[in-house]
């Protein structure tokens, strides 16, 4: 997780997105695959967590809540992490909206990706069998006058403390345990993530 106000140069998304054609009473309609899955209340959080991606995910959640506030939303996560403020906008929206947000880790959920994974609705947080989860403390970098560096250092420590409190709340671990375990990168397999309380169970097949 990066606290720095600077944004990384992000790799462009794939230029070609598969299209799905549906037959309706009015003829054929075509959707890009993500729009079609959004109709099924599926949202993808993939790649670096940054402002543009976070805004899109927040907008999709609010749209799905407006469509049906009673039905679950399914958030699929495959992310190495990213900018804390962007991730926290997604986190706060997940907690704010009425529908439960079920989180599913596919591939990896590292750093802010892991934080959002464990923020899903209790009992509805999942890993696929070979996915990996990594937790650690926030990363930060700032250049400037000594006084400004001191201000930013105090701020990142506040952010670290708040994120540890939230992680403890969602996992059931003690705050002291979270502080110890996030001092350095800690990688967990799917079974270890279940044992730690980051997720509730492992999905092997659809019901």
Swiss-Prot record:
Protein name per UniProt: ATP-dependent Clp protease proteolytic subunit
Keyword Ion transport: no
Major subcellular site: cytoplasm
Enzyme Commission number(s) from the entry: 3.4.21.92
Role according to the record: Cleaves peptides in various proteins in a process that requires ATP hydrolysis. Has a chymotrypsin-like activity. Plays a major role in the degradation of misfolded proteins.
Organism, as annotated: Salmonella typhimurium (strain LT2 / SGSC1412 / ATCC 700720)
Propiece residue ranges: 1-14
InterPro entries per record: ClpP, ClpP/crotonase-like_dom_sf, ClpP/TepA, ClpP_His_AS, ClpP_Ser_AS
Example of a GO biological process term: protein quality control for misfolded or incompletely synthesized proteins
GO cellular component, one term: cytoplasm
